[in-house]
Amino acid sequence: MPTYIKRHLRSLAVPRTWPVPRKSRGYWIVKPSPGPHSKEFAMPIAVWLRDYLGLAENMREVRYLLNNGKVLVDGRPIKDYKFPVGLFDVLAIPEINEYYRVLLDERGKLYLKKIDKEEANIKYGKIIRKVSVRGGKIQYTLTDGRTFLGDNSYKTHYGVVYEIPNFKIREVIPLEKDRKAYIIRGKHTGRIGVIKEVIKTDMPWPNIVRLEVAGEVGETWLDNIIPVPENFEA
């Protein structure tokens, strides 16, 4: 039997993080292209424009906006209507002076937080991988797939603040006590906590972090947080 590649998702099968009704647009909804974000933390740009922002009535209008360079993601025009726009990405429509950052609300749903033009030049992420390369350098990989070279000063799970579209690092946030962290899974999803302790566990279990959120102290897996700067607002 031939194998067919599905171009759409059943609307009932969309991730629970997507802020669209599970029966929206009938039986099917646009499936995201492969990208650095998992489906849990990203939606196709067409869904953001049509179903969330209401800037298009149909896919024809979505394609018009994209093909005419009216929509930017992280400062660059996007043509692919299935392009995944995910956590911390910056979605911009300069023609109408609208700028947004993808975040999670306290229900665990993705949403677009309105930001100003200056803030749209900044992005947040986390180091998820580090490997040695030629020349004695270390290559670091961030949550959105970007990479940079450096010495061995940083560790995985450190937060990073950088400029877009020209990738320039502004700050690296260590994973340490009293640093702020953005929570992406669990009871306090979408909120900012203060790190109280990082608890190392035996392999293969991930490490645990103890956080204080709104006066309440709790624990979660280290993979569920991203260190952020002091001025970060959810």
Curated annotation (Swiss-Prot):
This is Small ribosomal subunit protein eS4. CDD domains: KOW_RPS4 (cd06087), S4 (cd00165). PROSITE patterns: S4 (PS50889). It holds the Pfam family Ribosomal_S4e. It comes from the Archaea. Belongs to the eukaryotic ribosomal protein eS4 family. One of its GO terms (cellular component) is cytosolic small ribosomal subunit. InterPro entries: KOW (IPR005824), Rib_uL2_dom2 (IPR014722), Ribosomal_eS4 (IPR000876), Ribosomal_eS4_central_region (IPR013845), Ribosomal_eS4_central_sf (IPR038237), Ribosomal_eS4_KOW (IPR041982), Ribosomal_eS4_N (IPR013843), S4_RNA-bd (IPR002942).
